[in-house]
């Protein structure tokens, strides 16, 4: 819509979180952007932003995480700034959606379904503006669902709700990144060919099934270590270099709830 050539870079978990020098170098191996816009990261990457600027491009950071002492020297959009914005608990995609609204007005509302899914998946409080985003996004999903959503919904469902987003759709989308293929989730959202959408949906469903098996395996290993070593008072500390970083958070949450 703005006459620009846009490319999307999705980092893999193995490359670290947020804006990293390795990610920047990888981007510049393929092309030389004039502008880099971050989504859901960057507010804590002042040094990396400087590295980007030294590489010859401008930077806009859009993020929702807590503000560090050292803010990047660039345009930063974050609801945590004390600048009068009335709601500070948006998720990263919620911030991106608000940027789209600022640029495109009501025509950006067609992306409310994506913003709703991300809001639920990121476990931010379903209050205030988040509640509105999810409610309106669900209306879109239930009246004119995109293929990337409808392939995950059963024919017998009366309609999708927040529970559907959290436990039916989000795990399959997240599984792509956990299995080292985050680009497949992006491809699913941007693909228009019906056959390709179906194949990508099937791939993500398969990833999620594999992810569940891997998590169960890691959980059993962690339980064995816990039985052997015990806890430190009310603290459980377990570690194994073979454990996949994409699964440890899920297993840790499971153990925390159990104990």
Task: Name each region found by the language model.
Residues 70-121:
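Short alpha-helices
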Residues 20, 38-90:
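Histidine/acidic-residue-rich, glycine-tolerant segments that coordinate divalent metal ions
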Residues 1-35, 55-56, 104-259:
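Hydrophobic helix-and-loop "lid/oligomerization" segment in the mid-to-C-terminal part
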Residues 46, 71, 90-93, 97, ...:
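Amphipathic alpha-helical transducer elements in NTP-driven molecular machines
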Residues 10-14, 66, 95:
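A short, conserved beta-to-alpha structural element at the edge of catalytic cores
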């Amino acid at each position: 819509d703005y006459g620009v050539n846009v490319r999307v870079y999705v980092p893999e978990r193995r490359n670290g979180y947020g804006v990293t020098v390795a990610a920047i170098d990888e981007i510049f191996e393929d092309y030389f952007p004039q502008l880099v816009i971050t989504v859901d990261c960057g507010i804590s990457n002042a040094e990396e932003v400087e590295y980007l600027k030294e590489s010859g491009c401008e930077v806009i950071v859009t993020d929702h995480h807590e503000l560090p002492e050292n803010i990047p020297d660039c345009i930063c959009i974050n609801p945590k700034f004390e600048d009068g914005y009335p709601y500070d608990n948006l998720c990263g995609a919620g911030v991106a959606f608000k940027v789209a609204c600022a640029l495109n007005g009501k025509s950006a509302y067609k992306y409310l379904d994506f913003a709703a899914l991300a809001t639920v998946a990121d476990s931010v409080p379903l209050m205030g503006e988040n509640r509105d985003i999810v409610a309106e996004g669900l209306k879109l999903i239930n009246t004119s669902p995109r293929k990337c959503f409808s392939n995950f919904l059963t024919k017998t469902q009366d309609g999708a709700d927040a529970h559907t987003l959290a436990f039916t759709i989000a795990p399959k989308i997240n599984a792509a990144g956990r299995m080292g293929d985050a680009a497949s989730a992006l491809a699913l959202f941007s693909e228009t060919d019906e056959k390709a959408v179906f194949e990508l949906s099937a791939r993500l469903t398969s990833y999620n099934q594999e992810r569940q098996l891997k998590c169960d395996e890691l959980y059993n290993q962690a339980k064995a270590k816990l039985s052997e070593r015990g806890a430190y008072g009310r603290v459980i500390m377990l570690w194994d270099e073979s454990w996949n970083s994409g699964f440890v958070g899920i297993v840790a949450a499971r153990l925390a709830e159990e104990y």
